[in-house]
């Protein structure tokens, strides 16, 4: 709606003055009118998509959250954040498939849920390699206790100086695999054995991820436990 556009215009001007090169936009619900006359959901999506495009032109990269990534919005966005890499957790589900990555990898940047608000960091690093998703952190310069009564009250640990080493280590681990498949699409995803998956990309590069606590051997291929191997054809 026009109300949303006005809010964004004011913020965009301030961000441009601060020389910010990229933003993440949390978009309103498709039918929200912000005090304007009621409009249809389709028209609202149209206006929001236009706002994303204009913000990108003024500020730089614009990212949206996965659960707000409608086709109209994604057409103007640089990428998606908060990519969920979990199954629905129903008891009859045994494996997860990187559906979002299969659809979008190669056409836009994909980022994980914020790692400093989640557990199981070792497993999540492997998941990011399997899914072709880069790490994301929710960070502050100062101690987050100052945000206790704000919209960011959930940040228990976010100070950059506390997380710097973990950020560098995580990025290095993930980038070690994904640097070979930048801009490529996923063409195949298969389970080689329990806890071992292979993802193949359009440039014929395959990444084998081993989630188990023992080495995976197949001919000349050796994948250490809790690690991955990149196979270049």
Task: Go through the PLM ranges and name each one.
Residues 1-233:
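Active-site-proximal substrate-binding groove within the catalytic cores of carbohydrate-active enzymes
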